[in-house]
Amino acid sequence: MAVLAPLIALVYSVPRLSRWLARPYCLLSALLSIAFLLVRKLPPICNGLPTQREDGNPCDFDWREVEILMFLSAIVMMKNRRSITVEQHVGNIFMFSKVANAILFFRLDIRMGLLYLTLCIVFLMTCKPPLYMGPEYIKYFNDKTIDEELERDKRVTWIVEFFANWSNDCQSFAPIYADLSLKYNCSGLNFGKVDVGRYTDVSTRYKVSTSPLTRQLPTLILFQGGKEVIRRPQIDKKGRAVSWTFSEENVIREFNLNELYQRAKKHSKGGDMSEEKPVDPAPTTVPDGENKKDK
């Protein structure tokens, strides 16, 4: 099942994935990921390259290069076990392929390694990952409107994502959150987002750290009556996020979306938006920072 699940997900995501891969960021990233393969395999480029093969063939991998590529494959398979979307799978392949390419180029010639590293740095500085642009029922807040909206009508339940555009985890979660908003948004249950990378005072007020070391992005908070009820991921005593997978199933279960949606629809049909009693989250123990290790 560990092998079949990603394959099934890939088949169902082919149309969306093809549009995603057709963007310049992905095309350039793919080119950088196979750069060593092209240099090593394509004549006349490969003809003058050094090699450790016994037959002296410069246009084929030597045993050490094969070992590095096999190690890359093992790392990608391990990392992709926790990936939720196809974009995450492809992103992991791109990232670790570039690392392997850098090692292979430095091993081949330090000048080629420095050139490849320079190209990667230029790519990171000039090309940004494609943002999700699909359909959604999400209201975007700034540092002033978030408090006003949460307090404006306390009968409305809000689920707010605190995100930053530079975070790969936030980008991977974007289509999942958009799908949830399409399924569950109604008059009494609304979805919102606020960019804490841009509005840093919001991150301070709602205690969402933007440091990559804390791994708190993205953060989902459920507000009822203008007050926080549930937050994921939870935070341990050292201020680090407790490992939690941002899958559609986990969000639905932890935030009781089915119950919230049915209750909101019932109140909407009856014309009675009375105060909703808070939904109790599933009991979860936050481990001490002394013992918790990121999975």
UniProtKB/Swiss-Prot annotation:
Residues 1-48 form the signal peptide. Residues 126-295 are cytoplasmic. The modification Phosphoserine is found at S211, S243. It is a single-pass type I membrane protein. Residues 269-279 have a biased composition (Basic and acidic residues). It comes from the Eukaryota. One of its GO terms (cellular component) is endoplasmic reticulum membrane. The chain crosses the membrane at residues 103-125. GO terms for molecular function: disulfide oxidoreductase activity; identical protein binding. InterPro entries: Thioredoxin-like_sf, Thioredoxin_domain, TMX2, TMX2_thioredoxin_dom. Residues 114-269 form the Thioredoxin domain. A motif (Di-lysine motif) lies at residues 292-295. Residues 266-295 are annotated as: Disordered. It is found in: Endoplasmic reticulum membrane; Mitochondrion membrane. Monomer. Homodimer; disulfide-linked. Occurs in both reduced and oxidized monomeric form. Oxidative conditions increase homodimerization. Interacts with CANX. Interacts with ATP2A2. The thioredoxin domain lacks the 2 redox-active cysteines, suggesting that it lacks thioredoxin activity. The di-lysine motif confers endoplasmic reticulum localization for type I membrane proteins. Endoplasmic reticulum and mitochondria-associated protein that probably functions as a regulator of cellular redox state and thereby regulates protein post-translational modification, protein folding and mitochondrial activity. Indirectly regulates neuronal proliferation, migration, and organization in the developing brain. This is Thioredoxin-related transmembrane protein 2. The gene is Tmx2.
